[in-house]
């Protein structure tokens, strides 16, 4: 997908990887970048607008844990203004295994609800034009960081959900792919806790692991968007962008 002249919604587009990716998107010249985030960051919004004044950057407050009806109401407002939306990026996430229910609510349920809501506008069975979804998951969705099993499981759930969305594309007209960053230098990694405090030094230990910068990760994120490959499972690790070949161990046969 050429980003130029497209309308893009980015959920949590002001965080570490999210903000740098938003910068990369704006440089590529979309028509509109709509950022939905829990906390407004006027300085970041101003920076995005300054990068490319031709791009309309808009912010709406959004908490992914709100009821589905509220998400649909917000999207109704956005679609009424833009008429069409080409890409939804689901990027909300927390890493806090002390907060089990909140982790699942933000990392998985909120993403599913946002996706479900936009289907009202995109699903070709309802006369919609289709669209594309990029879900930010994690390499922990492939192989868990076992000291943070709740976070890892929530990301594995999103990888699975996204793969199902991709297979449903012939029915819905909506393609999907997953973005799976490796360990990246963000506040998410530098300060968090393990489940039941099984490893108090987990953040410190991960900090010793080979990492990448948010700039490296975001550059590859933009490349994945431009590739627009339905069903792709992208690994963004150590400054590289690689497609993961998923091993099938079972098939429902339907």
Swiss-Prot record:
Enzyme class: oxidoreductase
Gene3D superfamilies: NAD(P)-binding Rossmann-like Domain
Cellular compartments per GO CC: cytoplasm
EC number of this enzyme: 1.1.1.1
Residue numbers annotated as active site: 151
Catalytic activity of the protein: a primary alcohol + NAD(+) = an aldehyde + NADH + H(+); a secondary alcohol + NAD(+) = a ketone + NADH + H(+)
Superkingdom as given in the UniProt entry: Eukaryota
UniProt GO BP: alcohol metabolic process
Binding site for substrate: 138
Pfam families: adh_short
GO molecular function: alcohol dehydrogenase (NAD+) activity
Keywords: NAD, Oxidoreductase
Positions annotated to bind NAD(+): 10-33
Assembly: Homodimer.
Family: Belongs to the short-chain dehydrogenases/reductases (SDR) family.
Name listed for the protein in its UniProt record: Alcohol dehydrogenase
Organism: Drosophila immigrans (Fruit fly)
The organism's taxonomic lineage, starting at the top: Eukaryota, Metazoa, Ecdysozoa, Arthropoda, Hexapoda
């Amino acid at each position: 997908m050429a980003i130029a002249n497209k309308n893009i919604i980015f959920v949590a587009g002001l965080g570490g990887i999210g903000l740098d990716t938003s910068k990369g998107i704006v440089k590529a010249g979309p028509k509109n970048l709509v950022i939905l985030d829990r906390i407004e960051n006027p300085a970041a919004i101003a920076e995005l607008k300054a990068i490319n004044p031709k791009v309309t950057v808009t912010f709406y407050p959004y908490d992914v844990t709100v009821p589905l009806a509220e998400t649909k109401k917000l999207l109704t407002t956005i679609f009424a203004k833009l008429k069409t939306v080409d890409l939804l990026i689901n990027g909300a996430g927390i890493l806090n295994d002390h907060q089990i229910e909140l982790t699942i609510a933000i990392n998985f349920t909120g993403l599913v609800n946002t996706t479900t809501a936009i289907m009202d506008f995109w699903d070709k069975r309802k006369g919609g034009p289709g669209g594309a979804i990029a879900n930010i998951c994690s390499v922990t969705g492939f192989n868990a960081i076992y000291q943070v099993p709740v976070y890892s499981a929530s990301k594995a759930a999103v990888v699975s959900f996204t793969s199902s969305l991709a297979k449903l594309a012939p029915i819905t007209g909506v393609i999907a792919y997953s973005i799976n960053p490796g360990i990246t230098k963000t506040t998410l990694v530098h300060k968090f806790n393990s489940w039941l405090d099984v490893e108090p030094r987990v953040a410190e230990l991960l900090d010793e692991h080979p990492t990448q910068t948010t700039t490296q990760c975001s550059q590859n994120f933009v490349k994945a968007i431009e590739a627009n490959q339905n069903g792709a499972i992208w690994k963004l690790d150590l400054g590289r962008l690689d497609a993961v070949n998923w091993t099938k161990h079972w098939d429902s046969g339907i």
